[in-house]
Amino acid sequence: GRIQMNVLVINCGSSSLKYQLINSDSEEVLAKGLCERIGIDGRLVYQKEGMDKEITEAPMPTHKEAIQMVLDALHNPKSGAVKDLSEIDAVGHRVVHGGEKFAKSVVLTEEVLAKVEECNELAPLHNPANLIGIRACQDLMPNVPMVGVFDTAFHQTMPRKAFLYGLPYEYYEKYKVRRYGFHGTSHSFVSKACAEYLKLDLKNSKIIVAHLGNGASVSAVLNGECVDTSMGLTPLEGLVMGTRSGDIDPAIMEFIAKKENLDIDGVMNVLNKKSGVEGLSGVSSDFRDLEAAYNEGNPRAIDACEVFAYRVAKYIGAYVAAMNGVDAIAFTAGIGENTSFIREKIVSYLGYLGIKLDKKTNDVRGVEEIISTPDSKVTVCVIPTNEELAICRETVALVK
């Protein structure tokens, strides 16, 4: 039989689903795409490696129909990536919140899924959608092994001093209110890739990863283990993000609620969906638009970019303190990989670490590159993240 494995990686949102089929041997993507507007009207985007995107509008009342369409597309005689669905050897699912129950990836059994369900109240937007995707796959591919890869798992090595909030301790005991962190799969992948790229010994290193996308977080990785990260119980803590506020004085919530006559859901909606660089700039949550407005001298766009970069720099400084030093800083995700003027702003605050930016190499987009000068005391680099590949690797390791 075939030695290599084809792994279907699925990331289920509340009304969308992203997928990639990866050959685990060559690590090449055989096909990828997404389903959008599930439960509304439905649209499938499918792209076989080396071919054009195909877009199909079709009703998808639930995730089950969406996944059925993905499977149909994957073994379509014309543009399919496999001849038969039996060539899909395993499925890797992204699960957003594993709480304290999951410190690493696991094979999904009924027992495990019951535990995942217990984490639902910690991530009411994401986890139920992740579970629906898993159940739909089980129905459609009953004999294929499935693995859950948790966004929170990598951060489970944080010490108590880093994860406990200054709140009544009973909230932690009763409800597990504590800091969890997210993007763990990316932070783990990038910290390993960074050590490899720079020829550092991961087990004897201090690495700070800045995952800067529409959601953004920084992590401190000491000897290969996460010791702190900027997101908290939910992804709302920490950096200023695309539409999320990040750290604020909690009393602002009461103040705004009274002034604007909002209930708690209304205030949360503002903090999650209307804040961040979009709220500050009034332009966009997309840094391509922000950069254009910044270059035109739009004062609010300038504020948004300055506030964003300053907050990242402060967190990097905090994590140098947390690890009592740093060997390397890695930028990743959409903004981290592509937006050179933001990287330049962030690095401009780090001169005290003996870091100098190499303006030439900082102009790169989306490739591994060292962007600090050879005489910098700390190496700063860009390392593209690949969460799907990371999920594929985790899946293979457990299913083999």
Feature names for model-found ranges:
Residues 154-257:
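Glycine-rich phosphate-binding loop of actin/hexokinase-like ATP-binding domains
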Residues 269, 276-280, 287-322:
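Adenine-nucleotide phosphate-binding core of ATP-dependent small-molecule kinases
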Residues 73-89, 194-201, 316-327:
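Phosphate/pyrophosphate-binding loops at sites that engage ATP/ADP/AMP, CoA/4′-phosphopantetheine
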Residues 74-126, 147, 153-162:
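Short beta-strand-loop/turn "lid" adjacent to the catalytic site in phosphate-handling enzymes
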Residues 222, 228-263, 269, 333-364:
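Catalytic phosphate/nucleotide-handling subdomain of diverse soluble enzymes
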Residues 4-8:
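Extreme N-terminal starter segment of soluble prokaryotic enzymes
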Residues 302, 306-327, 336-400:
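Internal helix-turn-beta structural module
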Residues 16-60, 232:
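Short glycine-rich, Thr/Ser-proximal phosphate-binding strand/loop in the N-terminal lobe
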